[in-house]
């Protein structure tokens, strides 16, 4: 992948990688939350958005080129990161665009401090019914299994192999080619 963020925010739990382009009203782009997610997901749209805005594209803690500390990652951790990033790096009321699972903690960040978030745009957010489910015995057992050092590391290595990420990038390219014109135009019109 040819995406190399060039700026870092020294956050309390590690260095957070991000890019900054353009001038104008600030927009923060937040990627989905999967093992292979990063700000690279936005690389095709940042230039267009940067024509009239200051565009910040972040690699969340544990993703992309940001630090990956051996900690328990929670939604509240990301809520704190988003709030701190907007306050300490952007320093102005910001439009936040989020995809997938990251949408839920962007909403929580806004609820936590609505004075720093101007608008929220969610792309393919998680179903609210899934997000509000309480863990049961089976899900707790699966979580323990995934968090075990041997099996968890094994799964992480499988999901982050270069050929797996390249395969996903190719799938994304096919999907993007099909929908990108409509998607880009709608995002640019909103902003």
Where are these regions (language model features)?
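Active-site loop/oxyanion-hole signature of alpha/beta-hydrolase fold enzymes
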Residues: 57-97
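Gly/Ala-rich beta-loop-alpha elbow adjacent to hydrolase catalytic centers
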Residues: 98-106
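Conserved HGGG/HGGXW glycine-rich cap/lid loop of the alpha/beta-hydrolase fold
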Residues: 14, 19-65
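Short beta-strand immediately N-terminal to the catalytic nucleophile in serine-hydrolase-like folds
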Residues: 96-99, 123
């Amino acid at each position: 992948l040819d995406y190399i963020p060039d700026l870092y925010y020294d956050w309390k739990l590690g260095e957070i990688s991000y890019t900054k382009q353009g001038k104008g009203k600030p927009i923060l782009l937040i990627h989905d939350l999967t093992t292979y997610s990063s700000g690279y997901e936005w690389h095709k749209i940042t230039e267009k958005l940067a024509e009239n805005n200051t565009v910040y594209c972040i690699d969340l803690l544990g993703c992309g080129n940001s630090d990956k500390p051996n900690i328990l990652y929670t939604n509240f951790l990301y809520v704190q990161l988003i709030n701190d990033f907007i306050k300490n790096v952007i320093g102005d009321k910001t439009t936040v665009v989020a995809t997938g699972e990251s949408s839920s903690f962007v909403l929580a960040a806004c609820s936590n401090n609505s004075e720093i978030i101007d608008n929220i745009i969610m792309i393919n957010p998680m179903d609210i019914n899934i997000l509000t489910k309480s863990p049961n015995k089976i899900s707790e057992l699966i979580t323990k299994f995934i968090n075990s050092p041997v099996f968890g590391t094994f799964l992480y290595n499988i999901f982050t192999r270069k050929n797996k990420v390249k395969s996903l990038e190719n799938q994304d390219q096919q999907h993007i080619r099909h929908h990108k014109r409509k998607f880009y135009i709608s995002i640019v019109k909103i902003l």
